[in-house]
């Protein structure tokens, strides 16, 4: 009989301070980068789009000149889209298994998806991928109640369709939501800082960060606008010194 994990109990064991409110988003973006590492397509075709979604309710205020201006509002949902391998049988089975060893060589502990539910109400996943020479679509919700529906994979009766996986983090909880700055540029900087080891390899996919108010950043281009400093990384396993970008300039 397989061992099952109580999702609510597992999430309850996780400690996540409000200062680390963006870690669930970081986990999602890193998952997308790693998925693209494993797929055999040209780097120029690899792409990740991060949608930072604000509340649809528009708030306004009066500025010093008496003009009515729109105020920025909190991010309430995030959506990360990539064209990587997707939730095929192997990756989906790993998702269902706590402390999975599938990506242990990449430094993954196998509990990141539980981190999602510490800061968000639920996660919706929609993945279109190719397996056994057939196109499949897998769609499900992940919440404290587990995965629903359990039967969530279907074969698509088509010859070709875009490979795409969308992970939607829905319902940003407090105190995490209020701990994140409103500014999209600030979010861009934090994503670059967290994912810096991937950016300095030269093989990072195109990563676009955008909100639903018309602002956007190409993170691969943005990181070149940082001042240079020396960062020491230990690589396989000899220490190497690499020049990277860390202190911020304005991101335009």
What are the residue ranges of the model-derived segments?
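GHKL-type ATPase core
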Residues: 103-218, 222-230
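Conserved beta-strand core positions
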Residues: 46-48, 76, 123
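Acidic ATP/Mg2+-coordinating residue in the GHKL
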Residues: 82
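A short glycine-centered beta->alpha linker in the GHKL/HATPase_c
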Residues: 86-88
């Amino acid at each position: 009989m397989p061992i099952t994990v109580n999702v609510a109990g597992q999430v309850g064991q996780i400690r996540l301070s409000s200062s680390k409110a963006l870690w669930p988003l970081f986990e999602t973006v890193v998952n997308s980068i790693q998925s693209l590492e494993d797929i055999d397509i040209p780097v120029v075709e690899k792409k990740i789009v991060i949608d930072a979604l604000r509340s649809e309710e528009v708030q306004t205020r009066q500025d010093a000149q008496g003009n009515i201006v729109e105020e920025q509002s909190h991010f309430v949902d995030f959506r990360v889209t990539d064209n990587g391998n997707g939730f095929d049988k192997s990756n989906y089975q790993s998702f269902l298994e706590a402390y999975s060893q599938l990506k242990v060589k990449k430094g993954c502990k196998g509990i990141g998806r539980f981190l999602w539910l510490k800061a968000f109400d639920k996660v919706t996943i929609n993945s279109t991928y190719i397996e056994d020479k057939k196109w499949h679509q897998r769609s499900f919700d992940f919440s404290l109640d587990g995965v629903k529906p359990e039967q969530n994979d279907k074969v698509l009766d088509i010859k070709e369709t875009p490979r795409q996986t969308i992970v939607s983090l829905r319902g940003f909880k407090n105190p995490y939501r209020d701990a994140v700055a409103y500014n999209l540029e600030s979010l861009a900087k934090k994503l670059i800082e967290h994912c810096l080891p991937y950016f300095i390899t030269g093989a990072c996919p195109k990563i676009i960060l955008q909100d639903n108010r018309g602002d956007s950043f190409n993170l691969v281009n943005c990181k070149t606008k940082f001042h240079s400093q020396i960062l020491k990384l230990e690589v396989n396993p000899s220490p190497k010194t690499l020049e990277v970008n860390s202190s911020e300039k304005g991101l335009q």
